Amino acid sequence: MNMHEKILDNLQELVYIADMETYELLYYNRALAEEFHIPQRLHGKCYEILQGRRAPCPFCTNGKLSQDGCYVWKFYNQLVGRHFLLSDSICEFNGRQVRTEIASDITEHVLLQEQLDKNLSLQNFINHCARKLYRQDADLPFLIDDVLAA
């Protein structure tokens, strides 16, 4: 194991390198191996090992990548049931063009945001009901029926 691999293996983020023509996984770090429950040096196509597919993914970012920077996106991986923030880039590795992907698990953040959205929606509904019921000149039975119908 070289120094670069040692550094990548100590990251919490999931990292892999795949050949852009063949989709062959050339490297992945320990965090990815643990998250996907795969042996440290399993060989295969990225779409097979990381997505459980038989063909390249319809959402593959190879066509969106350029030499100028990275492509950042969010994705829910059904195979492991986790949400990720992904950063993909092109580089040269052993004389070939490869995609490097770094993935941060944002599942807890996504679940928290969903809960906050539900709470905000409920709070807005309660405020709407309270405003309707607070009107002093309102017909209370009508307002109660109106609020219950909302």
Summary of predicted features, one role per range:
Residues 1-3, 104-120:
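PAS-associated C-terminal cap
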Residues 1-22, 124, 128:
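Sensory modules in modular signal-transduction proteins
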Residues 20, 27-28, 42:
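PAS-family and closely related small sensory beta-sandwich domains used
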Residues 28-33, 144, 148:
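N-terminal capping loop/helix in small sensory signaling domains highlighted by a polar->aromatic N-x2-3-F motif
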Residues 32-43:
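PAS/PAS-like sensory domain cap-loop motif
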Residues 43-76:
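Terminal output helix/cap of sensory domains in signal transduction proteins
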Residues 86-100:
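Short loop/turn elements at sensory-signaling interfaces that couple input to output
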Residues 124-146, 150:
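Short regulatory/linker helices and ligand/cofactor-binding micro-motifs at input modules
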